[in-house]
Regions:
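Acceptor-binding helix/loop patch of EC 2.4 sugar-transfer enzymes
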Residues: 39-41, 105-151, 220, 296, ...
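Membrane-proximal helix-turn-helix segments that form the acceptor-binding/catalytic region
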Residues: 65-69, 91-98, 128-167
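Conserved donor-binding/catalytic core segment of Leloir-type glycosyltransferases
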Residues: 189-225, 231
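Acidic donor-binding loop of glycosyltransferase active sites
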Residues: 263-276, 289-290
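Short hydrophobic beta-strand element within catalytic cores of glycosyltransferases
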Residues: 289-297
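A charged, aromatic-enriched C-terminal amphipathic alpha-helix characteristic of glycosyltransferases
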Residues: 333-364
Length: 367
């Protein structure tokens, strides 16, 4: 097959492309590299700031658009798959729809349905937009609602979701959300995110008998993602048990340094309001780092995992984070098994070749 993967989130498309190429398919990734992360791509669609950057981007886009014709499959990372306004993107989408055989939409991140369903219907016990029946009103959540509800982004998302040939959800939460939309559930499936396994994942990183706890801080999204709560719990644990634990905090560091800091740790704190580990945590788990975050039973059920339980699941409260961290700090002998299970979990369910085979089956079924 001839496949175009358009857009990028956290290395999903770049990793999937590697797997599809290993299976013998022609696969092109066109993206901006996910902004500052600069993931690999075949066609660079990065948009730089300023009028000159806009002109350069539009020139690149017009030059590459004719190369985006004649594919068996075009997969979009999100309804906002290029750095363009929604009212302009709709014309690019319609062009792709006309000149390629099948369009697949990724439910991999924030879009209209993720915002609307989790604000109004609330199928999840907690999410980026609700905790039970309580609607979250932190600044970022409200900003995202204003961005996606009753705007051109809503129109674009509905149009692409309604006219695409299939929708793939990459996390259980996205699957549960889209499953609430009656007109879309008949053309939707779940496929896990692809991860390229680490070469030396089980190396013991514990230093001086201290458990090393890592947390990455994005100040603008700290409250929205629950990092503020996780950070406070971790700080209090280290203050209470300074001889047993140490905290590694990454904030505003270059991406390469960020990953080195992750790799030096034993635990990673990530995504308090999630049921499942996303790409950051999954990549850490592949290296034998234990994820403290989303590990609800729904996560294991959707992948039919009945044995492994590598994730230290926490509820979206300070008390839950503190209790779970304290337990592992006081029982460090449990770490080795959790690390082993973390690597096995990724191998079973997220290995990029296995995931690529699932996409291959889906794509072939659409042709």
């Amino acid at each position: 097959m001839k496949i175009l993967l358009l857009g990028e989130y956290s290395n999903v498309h770049a990793t999937l492309a590697k797997g599809l190429r290993c299976l013998g398919h022609e696969c092109i990734v066109a993206s901006n590299g996910d902004f500052w992360k600069q993931y690999g791509r075949d066609i660079d669609l990065e948009r730089k700031h300023g009028a000159l950057g806009t002109l350069e981007f539009l020139t690149k886009l017009l030059r590459h658009l004719p190369q985006m014709r004649g594919y068996d499959i075009v997969q979009l990372i999100n309804p906002i798959f290029l750095e363009l306004k929604a009212e302009h993107l709709i014309y690019i989408y319609n062009y792709l729809k006309r000149h390629n055989k099948r369009i697949v939409l990724g439910a991999f991140g924030i879009d209209y349905y993720w915002v609307k369903v989790n604000t109004d219907i609330r199928p999840l016990r907690y999410s980026d937009f609700n905790i039970g029946d309580y609607i979250r009103t932190d600044e970022i959540a409200e900003c995202i609602r204003r961005d996606w509800l009753n705007t051109p982004k809503e129109t674009l998302c509905k149009h692409i979701a309604g006219t695409s040939d299939w929708i793939v959800a990459g996390l259980q939460e996205y699957w549960a959300t889209y499953n609430e939309v009656v007109d879309l559930r008949k053309k939707m499936s779940f496929i896990p995110f692809p991860i390229e396994m680490a070469k030396d994942p089980t190396k013991d990183k514990t230093a001086n008998n201290k458990i090393r706890i890592f947390i990455g801080i994005s100040k603008s999204r700290s409250v929205y993602k629950g990092t503020d709560i996780m950070l406070k719990a971790a700080e209090d644990i280290v203050a209470q048990y300074p001889e047993k634990a140490e905290l590694i905090v990454a904030s505003g560091v270059p991406y390469e340094k960020y990953h080195k800091m992750v790799e030096s740790s034993d635990l990673i704190l990530d995504q308090l309001y999630s049921y499942t580990p996303a790409m950051n945590a999954l990549m850490a788990m592949s290296k034998g780092i234990v994820n403290v975050g989303g590990g609800e039973e729904e996560n294991y059920q959707i992948i039919h995992e009945t044995e492994l339980r590598p994730i230290i699941n926490v509820l979206p409260t300070y008390e839950s984070c503190y209790t779970e961290l304290e337990h592992i700090v006081l029982h460090p002998e449990k770490l080795a098994e959790l690390k082993r299970q973390s690597v096995e979990y990724i191998h079973r369910h997220h290995d990029y070749i296995k995931v690529a085979k699932q996409y291959e089956q889906l794509y072939l079924s659409l042709l």
